[in-house]
Amino acid sequence: MGRRNNTNVPDFILTGLSDSEEVQMALFILFLLIYLITMLGNVGMILIIRLDLQLHTPMYFFLTHLSFIDLSYSTVITPKTLANLLTSNYISFMGCFAQMFFFVFLGAAECFLLSSMAYDRYVAICSPLRYPVIMSKRLCCALVTGPYVISFINSFVNVVWMSRLHFCDSNVVRHFFCDTSPILALSCMDTYDIEIMIHILAGSTLMVSLITISASYVSILSTILKINSTSGKQKALSTCASHLLGVTIFYGTMIFTYLKPRKSYSLGRDQVASVFYTIVIPMLNPLIYSLRNKEVKNALIRVMQRRQDSR
C-alpha cells in the first residue's frame, strides 16, 4: 500500500445489493439474523469443545479452528454490509484494502484447514490403530499453524500487488464488499499482470487443497469398500459425511466465483455467490458439523447437566 499516491481516490463507494429502501431493510433484517445465528453457532461450538473433555481430540481441535475462521470471516464482511444497508456506502481506501486482506487471508486459511481435516479423517479411517500416534499434538498444531502462515503470506502478496492499481477518478465498487474482482474492474490501468498473479495464488491455493482432499477421500472410499459389515461402512461414511458436505459447498462457490477472467465478472450472479460464501456458509458450518453429530449433541447435554448440578 506504499503507492497510494498513484490514485486520486481517497475512498470507495460500495453499490450494495439493491437501491430499493424496502429491499435494503429486508436484507438488513435477514443478514442480521444470519449473523446472530453465525455468532451463536460458532461461539457455541468452540465453547462446547473447550468445556467437554471427551471432545479434546484432533478432529474437534480442527473443528474449533474452523469455527473461529468462520466467525472471523463473517465478522470481516457482515457488520460493514449491515452498516451500508442502513447508512453510508462509503469505505476508506485503507479500510477497503484491510477488508480485502482479511477476507483473502481467512478464505485461504479455511481452504488449507479443510485439507488438514481431510487428512485427519484419512488417518482415522485408513489407519485407526495408529491414529493416536500419527495425529500427535505436535502434528495437529503444525496442521493448523501451517494454513494460517501460508494464508497470511498469500494475502499479503495479493494486497501489495493490488495496491499498485491506478483508480483515476472512478471510485464506485460494484459489489457489497471489497473483493479483488470488482476492484480490478474499477482500475483504469492494464491489470493483466496482477490478474495473472491473483489467479496463480488463488488457483494454487484451491488446487493444492483440493488435491489433498481428493487424495484423502479416494483412499477413504477405497478403505470403506473393503469393510465387510454394513454397519461398519455406515459408521465410516457418517464420520466423513459432514466434512464432505462442507467441502463441496465451500469449494463449489469459491471456484465458481474466482477461477474465471475479470471480463466474465457479472454483478448480479457473482453477488449472489458472494453472499452465499461470505454470509451464509459461516452460518451453515456449525449446523453441518453438529446436527448429524451425536458426540456434539451428547457433549452439549453433559455441559448443560454439569451447569445445572453446579447450581
From Swiss-Prot:
Glycans are attached at N5. One of its GO terms (cellular component) is plasma membrane. The keyword Signal does not apply. The chain crosses the membrane at residues 26-46, 55-75, 99-119, 139-159, 197-216, 237-257, 271-291. Residues 1-25, 76-98, 160-196, 258-270 are extracellular. The keyword Flavoprotein does not apply. GO terms for molecular function: G protein-coupled receptor activity; odorant binding; olfactory receptor activity. Disulfide bonds join C96-C188. It is found in: Cell membrane. One of its GO terms (biological process) is sensory perception of smell. Residues 47-54, 120-138, 217-236, 292-311 are cytoplasmic. Odorant receptor. Belongs to the G-protein coupled receptor 1 family. This is Olfactory receptor 8H1. It comes from Homo sapiens (Human). The gene is OR8H1.
